[in-house]
Amino acid sequence: MLTLKIAVYIVVAFFIALFVFGFLSSDPTRNPGRKDFE
């Protein structure tokens, strides 16, 4: 049960990070200060 919970947390964190990174990369005009971040 603990392994399943850890796996779920890893998948959720991975999708959240992927969504945030993709959102920032595809919309640099909303965050002009983060252009040098990519």
From Swiss-Prot:
The organism's place on the tree of life at top rank: Bacteria
Membrane topology annotation: Single-pass membrane protein
GO CC annotation: photosystem II reaction center; plasma membrane-derived thylakoid membrane
InterPro entries found in the cross-reference section: PSII_PsbI, PSII_PsbI_sf
TM annotation in the entry: 6-26
Compartments where located: Cellular thylakoid membrane
Keyword terms of this UniProt record: Membrane, Photosynthesis, Photosystem II, Reaction center, Thylakoid, Transmembrane, Transmembrane helix
GO BP annotation list: photosynthesis
Function text: One of the components of the core complex of photosystem II (PSII), required for its stability and/or assembly. PSII is a light-driven water:plastoquinone oxidoreductase that uses light energy to abstract electrons from H(2)O, generating O(2) and a proton gradient subsequently used for ATP formation. It consists of a core antenna complex that captures photons, and an electron transfer chain that converts photonic excitation into a charge separation.
Family, as annotated: Belongs to the PsbI family.
Subunit structure and binding partners: PSII is composed of 1 copy each of membrane proteins PsbA, PsbB, PsbC, PsbD, PsbE, PsbF, PsbH, PsbI, PsbJ, PsbK, PsbL, PsbM, PsbT, PsbX, PsbY, PsbZ, Psb30/Ycf12, peripheral proteins PsbO, CyanoQ (PsbQ), PsbU, PsbV and a large number of cofactors. It forms dimeric complexes.
Protein name: Photosystem II reaction center protein I
